Amino acid sequence: MLMMLMMIIGITGGSGAGKTTLTQNIKEIFGEDVSVICQDNYYKDRSHYTPEERANLIWDHPDAFDNDLLISDIKRLKNNEIVQAPVFDFVLGNRSKTEIETIYPSKVILVEGILVFENQELRDLMDIRIFVDTDADERILRRMVRDVQEQGDSVDCIMSRYLSMVKPMHEKFIEPTRKYADIIVHGNYRQNVVTNILSQKIKNHLENALESDETYYMVNSK
């Protein structure tokens, strides 16, 4: 076991903004020093709903997420506990009954999702908050490609859902959370430049925290 300082970084933005790509880029730089926890896996259990009812749920609303469990799992990571996180099956529209994701305490915990800044208790756990700001047209195109490839949705279904649910929820709940961001990254960023800047900021934050004698956490090696 090693004595390490743990840093929690929130990454948010609209659906299709590029949050996952940025998260993966940061993880590639820090390797095993980074663990990722995705808000998408913390949609509430909907096993009591029929498939038809689940298809009509609004997924981009704060009430769709089990933030109590997400907050609890992040706190457990901070306490050097290994977390068994749920895995959400987007094809079935429900949590997987056969899969879980093991998340280990690390120097850097990336918390990624569309509404990770909306909940104050969740937001206050973060040392750095990053908002990925991408043009709406580009976001819907990215989402369309993803949902066709990964979920088998039709273009008509995607557009209908976007106009009736995704767009209104983005404007009401997601866009306003940019005011909580420490850093705003534009979605058409040059990956190498932005990722290197962010990685240096993360390193600086950890170094400054060490110098200021902030709290240390015992972090299990993976």
From Swiss-Prot:
Major location category of this protein: cytoplasm
Record carries keyword ATP-binding: yes
Alphabetized UniProt keyword annotations: ATP-binding, Cytoplasm, Kinase, Nucleotide-binding, Transferase
Pathway stated in the Swiss-Prot or TrEMBL entry: Pyrimidine metabolism; CTP biosynthesis via salvage pathway; CTP from cytidine: step 1/3; Pyrimidine metabolism; UMP biosynthesis via salvage pathway; UMP from uridine: step 1/1
GO CC term, one of those recorded: cytoplasm
Localization terms from the record: Cytoplasm
Gene3D superfamilies named among the record's database cross-references: P-loop containing nucleotide triphosphate hydrolases
Binding-site residues for ATP, renumbered to this chain: 13-20
Record GO biological process: CTP salvage; UMP salvage
Signal peptide: none
Catalytic activity: uridine + ATP = UMP + ADP + H(+); cytidine + ATP = CMP + ADP + H(+)
Pfam families, A to Z: PRK
GO terms, molecular function: ATP binding; cytidine kinase activity; uridine kinase activity
Stretches assigned to coiled coil: none
Known EC number: 2.7.1.48
PANTHER family membership: URIDINE KINASE
Family per similarity comment: Belongs to the uridine kinase family.
This protein's name: Uridine kinase
Highest classification ranks of the organism: Bacteria, Pseudomonadati, Chlamydiota, Chlamydiia, Chlamydiales
Gene giving rise to this polypeptide: udk
